[in-house]
């Protein structure tokens, strides 16, 4: 058994080539081979978001705090709240991040395939993000 104590792992800023705005990533766990699962706590400050990306074996997001948005390529923008669990299937192009007026923290869980857990694409532009209604309005649609 291995216990990783809270606060014992170093966090880092989300790289600007993959994120817009201030993002903090705290690795939580990474299994040893033959396991390939890893997880991190990711906090997006208000207005921060990930670029479009895919995961070769999918991704699960567990929203822990705040309010955010998630969208699959070509799909509607969905509001996400604490307790929501988002399942992104393998290869689904998507993005996620905070609303303009609230930070959002989620736990991200994904598996490695051939040494990769994510394939990054273009950033979610400010023009698209500015057109998003508030989380309350998205919830009502």
Language-model features, listed with the residues they occupy:
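A short, N-terminal "cap"/entry segment at the start of jelly-roll beta-barrel domains
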Residues: 1-37, 117-141
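Short, well-ordered turn and helix-capping elements at secondary-structure junctions
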Residues: 7, 27-32, 46-48, 74, ...
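Conserved short histidine dyad/triad with adjacent acidic residue
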Residues: 24-27, 38-55, 90
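Short, charged/polar surface micro-motifs in flexible loops or helix N-caps
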Residues: 33-35, 44-48, 67-69, 114-115
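Short glycine/proline-enriched turns and hinge-like loops at secondary-structure junctions
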Residues: 36, 54-56, 98-100
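A short beta-strand-loop-beta hairpin characteristic of the jelly-roll/cupin
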Residues: 49, 54-82, 92
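Ligand-binding loop in jelly-roll beta-barrel domains
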Residues: 69, 76-77, 81-82, 90-117
